[in-house]
Regions:
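Short, flexible, mixed-charge glycine/proline-rich loop motifs
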Residues: 2-15, 40-46
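Acidic/histidine-rich catalytic cores and adjacent linkers
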Residues: 195-198, 202, 242-384
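Basic, short loop/linker segments at the boundary and entry of helix-turn-helix/winged-helix-like folds
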Residues: 26-84
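Conserved beta-strand -> loop -> alpha-helix junction used to position metal-binding or nucleic-acid-contacting
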Residues: 195-240
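Short cysteine-rich clusters marking metal-coordination/redox-active sites
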Residues: 16-20, 52-55
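Short, charged amphipathic recognition helices of the HTH superfamily
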Residues: 85-96
Length: 384
């Protein structure tokens, strides 16, 4: 928490804070008025007034932890900290009133808005500082704003877990995601993006000229479930059911067992097996109107998808560092964890966001406070 000092420094300022251009460097003391402060320990300080001998501008210099506002920086930090921990605005005001520092809900909300805006600006400045990130993880989530669903993108450094950006997107379509991926790739200079298996991210990665690792946790369990469903469908086929030319029930069982082994091993060299299976079932006819898809057609679709996405699924095995170690995560858990900590954990206790400004600022504030540990964390936000 910020420290509140009761003693004002007698050291003259080094520049004149006048809005008009002034290059004065000499000042004289112009009184030492008392200022009432709302704080848990300090209730009043003396501010030092200075007069610029060049332009005559008179200004005040406050002790550490005190500004022009009635609240001390420590009290502002406490109100923000209580809210981030999960307390409502009303609960924050009740807690501070019990400490002898009553604040209104509007004042607490204003403290949140100020610190959230500064935290968001610091995250954006860090992202635009030409930082180098090799693997960028990104994922979308949905929250409610005044009853309307909003798309929020969480972008994270896959290696360190550091939040790069939390932003609100207008939509989750291909055009929006592609432009976003291109912008992030340009700002970070990344080589790889880590995401789920949505086609929008695949298009965005190709447009940005970067590699993509598809989260295996999004693909492997669903594919294994699909393999078992197709196996049950093949097992329950009636004897009189015709089979496509060149295919048989025994062959389907062998191919399903091979697919299960390929999915569990996830070896890059299995690409040619998938291409062979894809060619084997490429002539399987689709279902007629009103009919269910046959197991042969479902195998055709599954092998086609796997053969196309296999390089993206196994990039973590093929793409290694100079020392031979893997540095690309196989799953996008880093994004899921960041979404839970920065967005969802505090959002669960709310009835939705009331404005887009709050939606942009509060997750950024949570991410900044979670990552920037230490006593100077709040001081850097409140002093900005």
């Amino acid at each position: 928490m910020p420290v509140v000092d009761t003693v004002t420094s007698n050291t003259p300022p080094d520049h004149c804070p006048s809005k008009d251009p002034c290059f004065g460097i000499t000042f004289r003391r112009y009184g030492k008025p008392k200022k009432r402060v709302r704080d848990v320990h300090v209730h009043g300080v003396h501010a030092q007034r200075w007069e610029c001998t060049t332009c005559g501008h008179v200004f005040r210099v406050y002790p550490q932890g005190v500004t022009r506002r009635q609240q001390s920086l420590r009290l502002q930090a406490m109100s923000v900290h209580y809210w981030v921990l999960g307390m409502s605005l009303g609960a924050v005001t009740d807690a501070l009133a019990g400490l002898g520092c009553p604040l209104g809900r509007t004042t607490v909300h204003d403290n949140l808005r100020r610190t959230g805006t500064v935290a968001r600006r610091k995250l954006r400045e860090r992202l635009r500082s030409k930082m180098k990130v090799r693997v960028v993880a990104m994922d979308c989530t949905h929250v409610s704003e005044q009853g309307k669903e909003k798309v929020v993108m969480q972008t994270t450094d896959a290696g360190t877990g550091m939040t790069l950006e939390i932003t609100v997107l207008h939509a989750e379509d291909e055009h929006t995601i592609t432009r976003y991926v291109q912008r992030i790739a340009q700002l970070t200079g990344c080589e790889i993006i880590l995401s789920d298996d949505a086609d929008t991210f695949k298009t965005g990665a190709d447009a940005a000229g970067v590699h993509q690792q598809v989260c295996q946790q999004h693909v492997v369990p669903n594919t294994l479930t699909l393999v078992s469903e197709i196996a049950e469908q093949v097992e329950t086929l009636p004897p009189q059911e015709p089979t496509p030319s060149g295919l048989s029930v025994a062959q389907a069982f062998d191919d399903l067992a091979l697919l299960e082994d390929i999915i569990l091993a996830r070896a890059p060299g299995s690409q040619w097996h998938l291409e062979e299976l894809c060619r084997r079932y490429q002539e399987a006819p689709g279902p007629q109107k009103g009919q269910k898809a046959s197991p042969w057609y479902r195998l055709r679709l599954m092998t086609l998808d796997l053969s196309e996405d296999w390089p993206r699924l196994t990039l973590t095995e093929r793409y290694r560092g100079d020392d031979g170690r893997r540095f690309v995560p196989a799953t996008n858990n880093v994004s899921e964890r960041a979404i839970g900590l920065n967005i969802k954990e505090r959002y669960r206790t709310m009835r939705g966001y009331k404005s887009t400004i709050s939606l942009r600022c509060y997750p950024a504030l949570t991410a900044y406070l979670r990552e920037q540990q230490g006593a100077e964390c709040f001081s850097s936000l409140l002093a900005a």
